[in-house]
Structures are given as C-alpha cells and as structure tokens.
C-alpha cells in the first residue's frame, strides 16, 4: 500500500466517481480501478460500494479514509519540514454544534498558533456528523452537549463509535430572543410562555431526533417551527419574526450589538457541554490550548 494509492482513494471519495477522479488525477480509469482493488485486497476490506449511480463509502471504508487522511497529512508535514525546508504547518480541526463561544475560542487558538504556516479546520454541523468527523479523524475533537433528555442514547452512540466524552462545564438553559420581544422583560421564561412564538431548531439531516437535537425540549410539540442550518439565519429570524431558540445562554453581546438577549428558562434541566475524542487519543498542544479557551466561557453560576 503506497501513499499514492491513499491519495487516489481520497480523491475518489471526494468526487464520488472513479471516472471523474481519474480525469482529475490524469490517469486512466482502469488504472485507478485496479489501484483501488489492490488496496482493498491488501487491507482486507471493501472501501467503496459500487453502483450505476456512482460509488459511496462502506462503513469500513469511512474508517479507512480517516486513517488514510491522517497518513497523507503527516506525509505533507514531513515534506514541508524536510523537503521544502520551510517551518512545519500547525494543524488542528474541530467539529462543533452551533455555538458562538466555540467559534470565538477558535479565533483565539489561531491567534496563538497561527504562525507563518498552518492548516486549521472548523466545522459547525449536526450532532451525528460531529461524531462521524471525530471517529473518522476528519477533526481532532468535537463539541456537543449531554442532558437528562439525551444522555442515555448519546452515551450509547459515543461508546459504540469508540469515542469518549469529557465535560468542560455545565450551563442552565436560556431562551435567545430579540430585545424588543414581548417576553424580553421577564426575568424567567417558561415553555408555556413561548407557545405563541416560532421555535427555531437546527437541522440534523437524516438524524432528526430528540436525542441528536441541539435544542433542549425539542420533543415538546409546537404550532410554529422553523428548521435552519445556519446560525446567521437564526439571528435574522429572531429579529424579523419574534422567533426564539433554546441554548446555553452563552452569547457575547458584541456579535449583534444589544439586539439579542438571553433569558433563563424556568424548566429543570442542565446542559453538560463537553468534547468527544477517539479512545486513547492524546490531545495535541493546539487541542489543549483550545480547551483552555473554551473553559473561559464557563458560566459563573451554572
């Protein structure tokens, strides 16, 4: 198995077609197909499902791809350091639920480690995708929360994927809404108070479930609901529609002036915000630094 073969497999997985990948790699389709078959035979697994509509990764293939990507990244770092005679690149990646503070902490990380050359990765995505990204080593760690509502199922999924969860801090749920919202003057808001207004939830794709939801109490039926996949859209809908969402309450005011506020939710629940890693994985220095930055956002009185 060669580095070149791994690069071929990464390209095929990226474009989803052996024909298109062969064109981009400037080799013949039969040569590429043979290379993939040789790699599959040597690894003892089937990497791709093949069909008339194209190819997709198998479960074994997705895991293989994660390791292959790591090998290629390490090879590039080796070449950068000893072939080009340039300073080595600092690399680090995070997949996170849609939190402002995780993005802010990432900015501070880049400021600290962003030297002349670096390759950082930050992805806001759905809960299940975070687990996939960490499992397949697309990123170094993932940020998500556990609660009384989702903990049993989430811990089971985390364990099945050979991952481990470590809590960073806990936070009481808050309602995010615009400062002119009819409920903005209340010291505490109940789920009943929110009933007349549109609820905003983040899309979870094929894994739409209360257990993978990024919002607490998403299992409670509502008459008005909007699902989005962009944090900017959520802010716009709060401002334009008197909509709301439920989250941790950590939302720096400078991101939208004084327009968005958070009000404590009366319900008895706690968000345990933490990170997931592969089992037996050691954190890199950028990883340790990133977690330090995240801990700075811990609520004073959760």
What are the language-model segments listed below?
Residues 10-28:
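Short helix-boundary/capping micro-motifs
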Residues 40-57:
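A short LG(V/I)-centered, amphipathic sequence patch enriched
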Residues 42-43, 64-86, 101:
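Alpha-helical linker/hinge and terminal dimerization helices associated
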Residues 89-153, 228:
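Central regulatory/effector-binding core of bacterial HTH transcription factors
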Residues 102-108, 151, 190-191, 195-219, ...:
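Secondary-structure junction motif
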Residues 135-138, 145, 204-261:
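Hydrophobic hinge/microswitch elements
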Residues 157-173, 177-199:
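Flexible hinge/capping segments at coil-to-helix
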Residues 160-166, 171, 232-282:
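Beta-alpha-beta core module
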């Amino acid at each position: 198995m060669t580095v070149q073969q791994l690069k071929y497999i990464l390209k095929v997985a990226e474009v989803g077609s052996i024909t298109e990948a062969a064109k981009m790699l400037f080799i013949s389709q039969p040569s590429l197909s043979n290379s993939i078959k040789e790699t599959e035979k040597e690894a003892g697994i089937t990497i791709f499902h093949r069909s008339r509509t194209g190819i997709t990764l198998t479960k074994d293939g997705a895991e293989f791809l994660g390791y292959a990507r790591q090998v290629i990244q390490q090879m590039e770092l080796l070449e950068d350091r000893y072939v080009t005679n340039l300073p080595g690149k600092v690399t680090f990646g995070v997949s996170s639920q849609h939190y402002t503070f995780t993005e802010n902490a990432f900015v501070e990380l880049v400021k600290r480690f962003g030297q002349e050359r670096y390759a950082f990765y930050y992805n806001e995505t759905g809960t299940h995708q975070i687990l996939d990204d960490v499992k397949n080593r697309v990123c170094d760690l993932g940020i998500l929360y556990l609660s009384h509502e989702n903990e049993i199922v989430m811990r089971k999924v985390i364990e099945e994927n050979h991952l481990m969860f470590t809590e960073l801090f806990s936070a009481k749920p808050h309602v995010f809404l615009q400062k002119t919202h009819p409920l903005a003057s209340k010291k505490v808001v109940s789920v009943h108070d929110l009933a007349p207004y549109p609820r905003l939830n983040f899309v979870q794709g094929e894994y739409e479930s209360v257990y993978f939801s990024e919002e607490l109490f998403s299992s409670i039926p509502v008459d008005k609901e909007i699902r989005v996949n962009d944090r900017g859209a959520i802010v716009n809908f709060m401002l334009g529609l008197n909509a709301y969402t439920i989250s941790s309450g950590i939302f720096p005011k400078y991101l939208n002036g004084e327009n968005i506020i958070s009000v404590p939710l009366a319900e008895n629940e706690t968000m345990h915000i933490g990170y997931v890693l592969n089992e037996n994985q050691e954190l890199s220095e950028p990883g340790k630094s990133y977690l330090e930055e995240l801990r700075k956002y811990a609520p004073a009185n959760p």
